[in-house]
Amino acid sequence: MKNIRNIAVIAHVDHGKTTLVDGLLSQSGTFSEREKVDERVMDSNDLERERGITILSKNTAIYYKDTKINIIDTPGHADFGGEVERVLKMVDGVLLLVDAQEGVMPQTKFVVKKALSFGICPIVVVNKIDKPAAEPDRVVDEVFDLFVAMGASDKQLDFPVVYAAARDGYAMKSLDDEKKNLEPLFETILEHVPSPSGSVDEPLQMQIFTLDYDNYVGKIGIARVFNGSVKKNESVLLMKSDGSKENGRITKLIGFLGLARTEIENAYAGDIVAIAGFNAMDVGDSVVDPANPMPLDPMHLEEPTMSVYFAVNDSPLAGLEGKHVTANKLKDRLLKEMQTNIAMKCEEMGEGKFKVSGRGELQITILAENLRREGFEFSISRPEVIIKEENGVKCEPFEHLVIDTPQDFSGAIIERLGKRKAEMKAMNPMSDGYTRLEFEIPARGLIGYRSEFLTDTKGEGVMNHSFLEFRPFSGSVESRKNGALISMENGEATAFSLFNIQERGTLFINPQTKVYVGMVIGEHSRDNDLDVNPIKSKHLTNMRASGSDDAIKLTPPRTMVLERALEWIEEDEILEVTPLNLRIRKKILDPNMRKRAKK
């Protein structure tokens, strides 16, 4: 017991927490000399590596001077907030990682607030101090002010600070120390993080905080033993959060060391282990001693704030590019996702249509991107916010939005957001001619704003947002200004007709792209939809051309990635997703039927 420390790593996206965990792993001697350590070893999913973000909370364990340190890497995005809260219940200490230049970001605030409310005393790690524009002292002051604003206790305000450059593998307790290795950080963890409370002699109590799935073993629950001890093959009682009970045996008990998972025989109070043996396990369930059952408090997960409809692809080009195209395949895959992804919900809404709710656009687009890579073909509707009724009042989710932008663009941003029902809360000048703007805005107002924002700030602005609360409905929000250019023919697009269409707006397609009636091929420069023919070819004459009418110059099309396309579409459009293409189309393909439906 004395020789265990359980800590979580909290940081904003891209402040280097996964890199720091790499450094701790390699310097603690957990990897033997022979093992080659990948970079960002904790981000195991392809998308996580590509985007450099952590989506699922991971755990690993290292040994340092006979002490076992269990480290849980938490996601930094508020969209994955469901993951974060559960992790905080499992640990006794937190490393709060802050970028020495950027300071505290809004998504970190979300987690810090939770950690402080659980009474955890954080260790502040100021990372990336090797950046030329680093201002570690200012950042420490910012953290202090943030803690005060969030009502931290005196003990929490007296936090230890470690300065580090995780990439280069060194840490120091004061800025004048020698840059050697991460030892000062290990020492700080041992000194300031309490060892787990709880006793080996009490009856067994353990709580599951995240799920995993293994094709061979079935459902695996990763849990912390709060009291007592547990053996492999022991009979235990599973107490679910709704009060029901189930008897069973622990068929597998798995411990963590470095990145490896090894089967173990026993686990004691304070350990973090994985167990198998129950198919009905859920997050927040307790595993207790059948002779003396004492369940732990179930966990409260944040409610989803946004939903989209996933449906079977029914366009004219359906089934040509994907491996899995049927409703049953899609249903099985979505339900499998729900087994391990707790912050999301999925309901069947009739034949081949599923409503998936989550904590934000990012979470939903990550799911769609994963499905797409696995060879699924499907369509997605525009994201909608979830509206709740509280005491007879319609309420919608509001977000806290923080924008860092060059000063020249702040006027345009404030005007844009005003139309989207945002309320400005603060405006502070930062260094290098940047301004930080803070708003409270309905989540609906943020859908589709990111691409406008990048245009307004010429790509130099940074925006981050996190969930605030549900508030009374705020009326209608301005949506996309421009109409769509819609194909009125089936076939392959030709350069000749695209050349004539491009004066009308911005194209999304290249020549030789397959198109069908009702497919959106571009954005109109005006606010109405326009039906166009993209497959017309030039009539040949037996006159000799003068050369001037031969030169067809096409502007490169705007490439639509998943997030951008989901933000762009309106209520009457859907996004068709296949492993090879993304196509935007109207829900009603036939132009005459569409006109009738509008009336």
UniProtKB/Swiss-Prot annotation:
HAMAP family reported for this sequence: BipA
SUPFAM superfamilies, per database record: EF-G C-terminal domain-like (SSF54980), P-loop containing nucleoside triphosphate hydrolases (SSF52540), Translation proteins (SSF50447)
Organism lineage string: Bacteria, Pseudomonadati, Campylobacterota, Epsilonproteobacteria, Campylobacterales
Swiss-Prot/TrEMBL catalytic activity: GTP + H2O = GDP + phosphate + H(+)
Compartments, record wording: Cytoplasm
Subunit-structure text: Monomer.
InterPro entries listed in its UniProt record: BipA, BipA_C, BipA_GTP-bd_dom, BipA_II, BipA_III, BipA_V, EFG_III/V, EFG_V-like
Top-level taxon: Bacteria
GO BP, sorted A to Z: ribosomal large subunit assembly
Species of provenance: Helicobacter pylori (strain ATCC 700392 / 26695) (Campylobacter pylori)
Protein name as it appears in the record: Large ribosomal subunit assembly factor BipA
